[in-house]
């Protein structure tokens, strides 16, 4: 988050110690280097873990110097000072503190990825060792062994690189599979170099990625796995640039990649029955979208251009248009996702910063949206985005503003944009409603009419 705990946060020093404690206990060794001899760690994993740990110790030591006491949290007020202390300078339009925080987040992501391998390794060695062996082949290149997905051979990805996407599709389409075997996670992490321009140009890989975005089970979990193992940023290089990318402000508390995947998670959760109570309209809309994968693509790209300089919405719109062309979206689908990325902030802006009781504001927003389909997709994207920016950002009040804007715009679109908005008609309608309420309570309307005479239609 915005102020991660260097010791106890996921991927922090405690995770490194946990690797040491559990592995040394299981293998009965005293030094981490002996874990290489035991085959638990590969040599390059050992060296990378050492480098990552050394970086975190430097950060922790620097924090203690700055705070003049034991301080484990990378407090916002300390981040800029610590970045300068460690040699990160402002350069090429990017703040030194943002470069430092990106290095931090990429480091803990690397440790988390290695943790996946090692903890799965221990799970198999300790808890699954005496299980009844049950294997079932699920595709030409993969089979399920005791609930865990495995490759047919130790070099499957070398001969079948497409498997680097297919394995996540299988997980997204088969909810009964518990996870991936440690040896296979290791293969994935060590095969990212196979994802090159030719891989990205392969129609089969592109179709598989689109199939993944339609997968019924735990899509955000699979995308997070792909991110930890380095696959997502290799397949989508533009996504790779935002991995660990932080904005040094108090508004955005997550790195851009984490925020993006959280938006997708929020959107997909709307399909759950329990979400209908908290988000009744967005939930209903999402369940009835003709092409929900277009919303997922828009979410994946809405902040893709953060950190480049310039208008990230416009730059991201160009990126998603390129993605759409590569993945053979229809022209109308491309136009929709491009529009959503370019305009993903407008509904939040209008609902919170403009007077949505003004018919002209509603009419202007309805003109920007154009039709009901664009309004539906934008509303769900906006709800998912706000909830993934900062847990404290979403309030019932902001939710009611968004819902009010949605409903008024829906009515404006139903009425037709070609019909000019008559403020006096809106005002008269309001008077009629009030008059009816007054009469129901046996209250004379003369006093209200006197007040109305002193104020305008607004």
PLM features per residue range, with description:
Residues 76-81, 128-134, 184-192, 239-245, ...:
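A glycine-rich phosphate-binding loop feature that marks nucleotide/adenosyl-phosphate handling sites
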Residues 197-298, 307-313, 318-328, 342:
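Long, K/E/R/D-enriched contiguous segments that form extended
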Residues 18-20, 262, 388:
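Hydrophobic side chains within alpha-helical segments
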Residues 55-56, 95-149, 219-221, 366-458:
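Regulatory modules associated with amino-acid/nitrogen control
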Residues 37, 44-45, 49-58, 65, ...:
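Divalent metal-dependent catalytic cores for phosphoryl transfer on phosphate-bearing substrates
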Residues 1-252:
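Non-catalytic interface/linker regions that flank or bridge core catalytic/transmembrane domains
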């Amino acid at each position: 988050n915005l102020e991660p705990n260097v010791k106890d946060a996921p991927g922090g020093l405690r995770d490194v110690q946990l690797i040491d404690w559990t592995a040394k206990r299981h293998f009965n060794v005293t030094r981490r280097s002996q874990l290489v001899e035991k085959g638990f760690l590969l040599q390059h994993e050992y060296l990378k873990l050492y480098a990552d740990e050394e970086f975190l110790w430097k950060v922790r030591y620097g924090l203690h110097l700055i705070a003049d006491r034991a301080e484990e949290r990378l407090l916002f007020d300390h981040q800029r000072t610590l970045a300068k202390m460690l040699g990160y300078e402002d350069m090429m339009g990017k703040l030194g503190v943002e470069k430092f925080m990106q290095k931090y987040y990429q480091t803990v992501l690397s440790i988390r990825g290695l943790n996946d391998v090692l903890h799965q390794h221990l799970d198999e060695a300790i808890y699954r060792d005496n299980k009844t062996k049950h294997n079932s082949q699920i595709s030409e290149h993969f089979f399920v062994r005791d609930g865990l997905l495995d490759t047919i051979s130790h070099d499957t990805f070398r001969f079948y690189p497409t498997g680097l996407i297919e394995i996540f599709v299988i997980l997204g389409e088969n909810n009964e599979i518990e996870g991936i075997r440690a040896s296979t996670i290791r293969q994935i992490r060590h095969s990212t170099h196979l994802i090159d321009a030719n891989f990205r140009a392969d129609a089969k890989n592109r179709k598989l990625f689109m199939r993944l975005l339609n997968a019924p089970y735990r899509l955000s979990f699979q995308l997070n796995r792909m991110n930890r193992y380095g696959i997502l940023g290799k397949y989508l290089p533009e996504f790779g640039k935002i991995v660990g990318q932080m904005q040094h402000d108090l508004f955005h508390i997550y790195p851009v990649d984490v925020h993006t995947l959280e938006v997708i998670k929020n959107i997909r959760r709307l399909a759950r029955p329990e979400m209908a109570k908290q988000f009744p309209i967005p939930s209903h809309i999402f369940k009835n979208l003709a092409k929900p994968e277009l919303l997922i693509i828009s979410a994946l790209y809405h902040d893709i251009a953060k950190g480049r300089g310039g208008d990230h919405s416009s730059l991201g719109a160009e990126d998603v248009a390129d993605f759409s062309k590569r993945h053979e979206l229809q022209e109308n689908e491309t136009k929709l996702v491009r529009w959503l990325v370019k305009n993903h902030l407008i509904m939040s802006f209008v609902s919170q910063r403009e007077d949505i009781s003004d018919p002209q504001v509603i009419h202007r927003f309805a003109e920007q949206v154009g039709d009901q389909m664009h309004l539906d997709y934008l509303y769900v994207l906006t709800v998912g985005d706000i909830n993934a920016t900062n847990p404290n950002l979403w309030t019932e009040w902001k939710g009611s503003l968004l819902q009010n804007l949605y409903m008024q715009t829906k009515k404006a679109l139903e009425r037709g944009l070609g019909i000019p908005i008559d403020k006096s008609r809106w005002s008269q309608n309001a008077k009629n409603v009030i008059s009816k309420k007054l009469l129901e309570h046996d209250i004379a309307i003369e006093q209200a009419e006197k007040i109305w005479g002193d104020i305008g239609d607004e």
